[in-house]
Amino acid sequence: VSDKGKDKTFVPPQERNIAMVFQEYALYPNMTVRKNMSFALETKKAPKAEIEKRVTAMSSMLGLDELLDRRPAQLSGGQRQRVALGRALVRDPQVFLLDEPLGNLDAKLRDQVRYELKKIQTKLGITTVYVTHDQTEAMTMADHIVLMKDGHIMQQGTPDDLYSHPNCLFVASFVGTPQINKLKCKVVAEEGAIKLVCDQLTLNAPDDVKELLKLYVGKEVIIGIRPSELVMAPEGQGELNGVVDSVEPLGDGFHVYLNVDGQVLVAKIAGGSTVIGKSLSLNVEKGKMHLFDSVTEERLNVG
């Protein structure tokens, strides 16, 4: 483990200058907010003027000025979380470690604190390692994501890298809401054309992957299509023509579940409207079909 080029592997934890905040706030119940925030600095015998300066600056940044004389029992969940953050940040750490810090918050408060955390991190410029099982938190907050499974790194990169260019089926399925549509298809060469036969559903191979699929004729592949990459087409003239099975209104659009020859696909449609039982046609956005090996589940196409 290195920090700014210095090997910290065998440095005692208390000397690494890493601040940590966990799902449980672990505030001292008998201390005020002010005392909770200043305690670590006091134990290091920092000058009183410096302690006051740091606590005042951090409480102002986190909106805690009016809460400094209260105890944890008098605070809401969101306020306690901000106190825990403030207590860590006043130390001026080199690295900030957050382990599922929003796990105890309700959905509305989680959105608010997520926004505040991102703003604070950007303002302070502290390298932050944020551990979460929530892909929405990872996608909305991270500059760089490391996606792990069973202790192994599956892929790392920017949020867009993982969303638009997943290197395997696991990554493609984990990132994105609703989950990516997955179809196991057999690659067939028919009268000079390359087709994807998925049970009763048959698709013409998109131009950008035809050459690649020629190598897999007679074999199975898995195609992945994100709901947001399906667009409406004139009725009966789409690559996917089916009947609406279910609709989830979102206000500014809707999720539509389309039964296409026995395969149910979900599409994320902006604007417009549709009803259950109606015929609907969809196209896949050009260059947006993801191909995976049916055995290794690794990505086949580079795009």
PLM feature segments, named:
Residues 4, 105, 112, 165, ...:
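Residues that scaffold the ATP/ADP-binding catalytic core of kinase and kinase-like folds
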Residues 8, 158, 170, 269-270:
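Short beta-alpha junctions and helix-cap segments that line functional grooves
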